[in-house]
């Protein structure tokens, strides 16, 4: 209980009974043995999530793309695998293919993820103008609005366009108030803009949400040059 008598934590023991043993995990079929593209995608996704030691999710996605080269989800999945492997140019092509299918009949897609991922791959190659456009297009979809605006704000910051960066990071925070990366970026933007008091106030607000926001704590050290802050982070 807290000081006001509110229940904070409660524990109830399970009844002493023997529960049925869960079914053992089934081995994945070989890609050629799987009939549908849907199941190929889901199998690849499952293998990624569980980081299987002997099965390669890429094989399942590539089998799906042999049957349907324009499949949106499998192109996006292959692109992401290539991103994690540092193959940014290869990833870009798969995201383009996913987007081509996604926008065949509707220029404003129902899912902004391939556009966001395309922006990420382009940014990692230093193609900032193209990345900027891709990130912006991702914001058409509400689910990717905060991530898209955050990507735009990052490129604004790379260009040292602090006014635009502040505008876009605020848009990211409107859609995800607890985006801790965006909070650190906003603190950095305010510092670069000479708004140190605003930056410190925003940092304190952010640390009330999450005391482990190390990006904001480092910004606080950077502004005040207070070694105590740095020591607390590294202790």
Regions found by a protein language model. Give the residues of each.
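Alpha-helical segment of the N-proximal tetratricopeptide repeat
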Residues: 35-67
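Position-specific recognition of the canonical hydrophobic site in helix A of tetratricopeptide repeat
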Residues: 48-49, 83, 116, 123, ...
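Residue-level recognition of tetratricopeptide repeat
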Residues: 45-46, 80, 120, 154, ...
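TPR alpha-solenoid repeat register
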Residues: 74, 107-109, 114, 148, ...
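Structural marker of alpha-solenoid helical repeat scaffolds
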Residues: 67, 101-107, 141, 175, ...
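Long, contiguous interaction/recruitment modules in multidomain scaffold/adaptor proteins
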Residues: 1-35, 216-218
């Amino acid at each position: 209980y807290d000081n006001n008598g509110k229940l904070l934590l409660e524990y109830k023991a399970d009844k002493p009974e023997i529960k049925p043993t869960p079914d053992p995990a089934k081995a994945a079929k070989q890609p050629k043995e799987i009939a549908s593209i849907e199941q190929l995608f889901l199998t690849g996704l499952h293998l990624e999530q569980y980081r299987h030691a002997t099965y390669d999710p890429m094989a399942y996605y590539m089998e799906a793309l042999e049957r349907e080269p324009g499949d949106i989800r499998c192109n996006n999945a292959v692109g992401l695998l290539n991103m994690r492997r540092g193959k940014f140019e290869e990833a870009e092509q798969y995201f383009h293919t996913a987007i081509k299918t996604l926008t065949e009949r509707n220029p404003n897609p129902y899912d902004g993820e391939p556009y966001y991922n395309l922006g990420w791959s382009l940014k990692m190659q230093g193609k900032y103008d193209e990345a900027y456009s891709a990130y912006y297009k991702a914001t058409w979809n509400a689910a990717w609005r905060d991530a898209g605006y955050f990507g735009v704000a990052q490129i604004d910051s790379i260009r040292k366009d602090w006014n635009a960066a502040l505008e876009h990071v605020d848009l990211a925070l409107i859609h995800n108030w607890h985006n801790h990366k965006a909070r650190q970026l906003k603190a950095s933007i305010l510092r670069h803009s000479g708004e140190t008091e605003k930056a410190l106030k925003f940092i304190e607000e952010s640390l009330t949400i999450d005391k482990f926001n190390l990006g904001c704590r480092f910004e606080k050290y950077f502004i005040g040059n207070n070694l105590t802050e740095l020591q607390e982070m590294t202790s």
